[in-house]
From Swiss-Prot:
It comes from Campylobacter jejuni subsp. jejuni serotype O:2 (strain ATCC 700819 / NCTC 11168). This is Large ribosomal subunit protein bL35. GO terms for molecular function: structural constituent of ribosome. The keyword Ribosomal protein applies. Belongs to the bacterial ribosomal protein bL35 family. GO terms for cellular component: cytosolic large ribosomal subunit. PANTHER family: 54S RIBOSOMAL PROTEIN BL35M, LARGE RIBOSOMAL SUBUNIT PROTEIN BL35M.
Length: 63
């Protein structure tokens, strides 16, 4: 049986580390002028996928 294909959009969005899946922050693409610098600094840092979504993301990545 052939290997399962991973979802290519998911491969571009997520990085797999030590037992955790890293993701980028949302709300950073446009209309940035009205958002405070403090908020933008917080959004710059990487986040981890929430435990409720890990199973779905792993399935997309073929893990």
């Amino acid at each position: 049986m052939p290997k399962m294909k991973s979802v290519k959009s998911a491969v571009k969005r997520f990085k797999v580390g030590k037992n955790k899946i890293k993701r980028g922050s949302a709300f950073r693409s446009h209309i940035l002028t009205k958002k405070p610098a403090k908020r933008m600094r917080g959004l710059r840092t990487a986040k981890y996928v929430h435990s409720t979504n890990v199973k779905a993301v792993e399935k997309m990545l073929g893990i």
